[in-house]
Amino acid sequence: MSKAKEGDYGSIKKVSGPVVVADNMGGSAMYELVRVGTGELIGEIIRLEGDTATIQVYEETSGLTVGDGVLRTKQPLSVDLGPGILGNIFDGIQRPLKAIADVSGDVFIPRGVNVPSLDQTKQWEFHPSSYRVGDRVTGGDIIGTVPENTLLDHKVMLIPQAKGTITYIAPAGNYNINERIIEVEFQGTKYEYCMKQSWPVRSPRPVVEKLLADTPLLTGQRVLDSLFPGVRGGTCAIPGAFGCGKTVISQALSKYSNSDGIVYVGCGERGNEMAEVLMDFPQLTMTMPDGREESIMKRTTLVANTSNMPVAAREASIYTGITLSEYFRDMGYNFAMMADSTSRWAEALREISGRLAEMPADSGYPAYLGARLASFYERSGRVACIGSPEREGSVTIVGAVSPPGGDFSDPVTSATLGIVQVFWGLDKKLAQRKHFPSVNWLISYSKYLNALEPFYEKFDNDFVDIRQVAREVLQKEDELNEIVQLVGKDALAESDKIILETADFLKEDYLAQNSFTKYDKYCPFYKSVGMMRNIVTFHRLATQAIERTATGNSDGQKLLSNIIKAKLGDLLYKVSSQKFEDPSDGESVVTGRLNELNDELKEKFRALEDEYS
C-alpha cells in the first residue's frame, strides 16, 4: 500500500455484511479489484453511482469502520494461468490453500492474506517449439511445452492480445513462471512474456468458432452413458434433494470420465464433504492405456469454497473454475468442470442482491438469475482454438442443483433446465430404496441423442435400436405397475409379464450400480452395451416364444412366463449377474463372455420353442 498514490484511495462510507459502500472512488471501473481497510481485504466493485462505489468483499468484514481506506488496483479480478494449476487446491478467488496453511500455520485462512496463486520459485522444464527469432507470432500460438506431470503436457501459449515478430525465445532449460521466455516486437515496441498469464474471470477467453459436439462424455455410469448421454463440450444438470447422491455422481465423473482433466468446484458445500474430496482424490488412481497407475490429482484442480467461507467468494468460485477450464481448453484439451452446487451460488447472488436493496423476483432471487446462469453455462462448448497449430478443445459443464425439498419447480432448477441440454433428475424415492445412482429414467432426458448417433453407429450398429427397446420397456412397466396395484400380476397378459421381468433386470441389474465395489465402480461403454444387448435379447426372444407357441403343443401345453422362469432359471441368473464381470480382466475377455451368454440365450429359447410348438 505504501507505493500507492493518495488519489488511488477512497474511504468507507457504509458496511453491510459482505457489501461495503465507499466514497471518493471517481475513475473506478465496474468489476475492478480493490483492497479494503487496513487489513487489505480483497473486494470487487459491483455498482458505480457518481464517485460512490458499492463493493462486495471476499473476506470477513467485521472490524471495518467508516473512514477506512479503499485502495484501487486498476485491474479486474483475475486468475493466474500457468504451470502449477493441476494438482493444486484453491479457494474461490484462487488463493492456494496449502501455501496459506504453510505460511500462516493456522487451519483458518487469515484475513487479508496475500499469497501468490502459483509457486513463483519452482523451476519448470521448458521445451521451446519450432519458432525462431524473426518468425511472426500471434495470440494463442504455442511457443513451447512444460511437462507439468506424467499425464499432461502444459502448453505455453502467447496471451490472446499478443502479436508481432520474435526478437528472443528462451532455449530449452529450467525457468520459473515469471522469467522471460519470449520477446516480441510490434510497431517498434518490444513486449516480454513469461509462462504465466492473467485473465479476468468474468470475461470468456476468445475462440475462433464454436463447433458441433459429437463425442460422448463417458462417465462409467451405465444409466448416464446408455440412456442419457452427455457430450464433450455439453452442459448437464443434476438436480436432486439432499441425500440423493449428487456429490457421488459428481465425484464419479471426476474420477472416471473420459475427459483430459477436471476442475471440481465445491461451491458452498459442507466443509466435511469438501474435506472428504480432499482426502479421497490424492489417494485415487486411474489406469492408463499402457497399464500404469497414475494419481487422479494429476489431472484435477480443486476449487474449495465451503459454506462457512464468505458468501461473496462463492460467486467468484464458479467464474474462477470456468476460467481455469477455458485455459486448458485453449491448449487443445477436453476439460470437464463440476459445479457442486449452483444452488449455493444462486443463494449468494440472492444475499448480495438483498444487501443492495434490488427488487427481488421469484423466491427472493434477483431478476437477473437466469441471465447469470446462462452466461456461465454458455462458456461451455467444443471450439476451434485461436493460434497455431490448429487445434480443438472443449469444456463440459456439469452443474449440481440442490432444490429445497427436492422441488424441481424451484427458480434455480427451472432457470437451469431452460439452458442445459442434459437433465439427470435424481429421485428421493429411488434413493430411499437404496437404488443408486438414483437417476429417474422417466423424467431425465438428453438432447444430444441425435448428435451422437454417428458415434453409436460406428461403435455398435444396433445399439440405438437396443436402447430404444429398453426405454420402451421401462415406460411400459410404469404404466403396467398401476394395473398391477389394482388387479394383481396374475391378471396381466403373458407378454406383459415378460415386460415386468425385463424391467426388473434393467432396474435392479443394469441401472443400479454400486460405486464402492471393484467390478461396478466404473463400467466401460463396451460392457454397458453388452449387458443391455443381453437383457433386450431376453425380452425379444421371450416375447417371440410366447407369441409363436400361443396355440400350444400336441399336448395342449402353452409356454407361459412362469415356465420360462422355471426352465431357464440358471440362464436368467447369469443375465442378472452380468454386472459382476470385472473390467480389469480386459475388453476382449469381458466382451467374449457377454457374447457367449447372448448365444446361449438364443440356443435355449430355440429349444423351448421346439418343445412347446
UniProtKB/Swiss-Prot annotation:
Organism of this sequence: Acetabularia acetabulum (Mermaid's wine glass)
The keyword ATP-binding is assigned to this record: yes
Any one GO BP annotation for this protein: ATP metabolic process
Family, as annotated: Belongs to the ATPase alpha/beta chains family.
Purpose of the protein: Catalytic subunit of the peripheral V1 complex of vacuolar ATPase. V-ATPase vacuolar ATPase is responsible for acidifying a variety of intracellular compartments in eukaryotic cells.
Enzyme nomenclature, EC number: 7.1.2.2
Origin superkingdom: Eukaryota
Catalysed reaction equations from the record: ATP + H2O + 4 H(+)(in) = ADP + phosphate + 5 H(+)(out)
GO MF annotation: an example: ATP binding
Keywords annotated in UniProt: ATP-binding, Hydrogen ion transport, Ion transport, Nucleotide-binding, Translocase, Transport
Gene Ontology CC entries for this record: plant-type vacuole; proton-transporting V-type ATPase, V1 domain
Subunit organization: V-ATPase is a heteromultimeric enzyme composed of a peripheral catalytic V1 complex (main components: subunits A, B, C, D, E, and F) attached to an integral membrane V0 proton pore complex (main component: the proteolipid protein).
Protein known as: V-type proton ATPase catalytic subunit A isoform 2
Binding site for ATP: G240, A241, F242, G243, C244, G245, K246, T247
Pfam families in the record: ATP-synt_ab (PF00006), ATP-synt_ab_N (PF02874), ATP-synt_ab_Xtn (PF16886), ATP-synt_VA_C (PF22919)
